[in-house]
Amino acid sequence: MIIYEDAVIDYLDDLVYELYKKEYFGFLESAYNFADNIIDFIENSIDTFTSKKTPESLQHFGSKYIFYKSNQRTTWYIFFENFENKYLITNIINSHCEEAKYL
């Protein structure tokens, strides 16, 4: 079971509109597909992809993380908590964020 904190869902929704508004994608549907690819990666990989322990300075994001490389310039870091087969997605940042330099 995978659960997303409300803030993560809000972030992904905002991301779609920001990518479209800044013309990274010419169509809103393309921006939605981009966000869907991140979600698909989480849904299909979180239980098989080797997770890493989050550095102490970023523990407020979540105790573990996995990463998804969406293209040559951008890597997405997905933070979470888990117990057995239950996962709580607590935060998502990308390699362009200041905090990513600590990963």
Where are these regions (language model features)?
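Basic, Lys/Arg-enriched alpha-helical interface segments
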Residues: 1-65
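Enriched for short, Lys/Arg-rich terminal
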Residues: 68-103
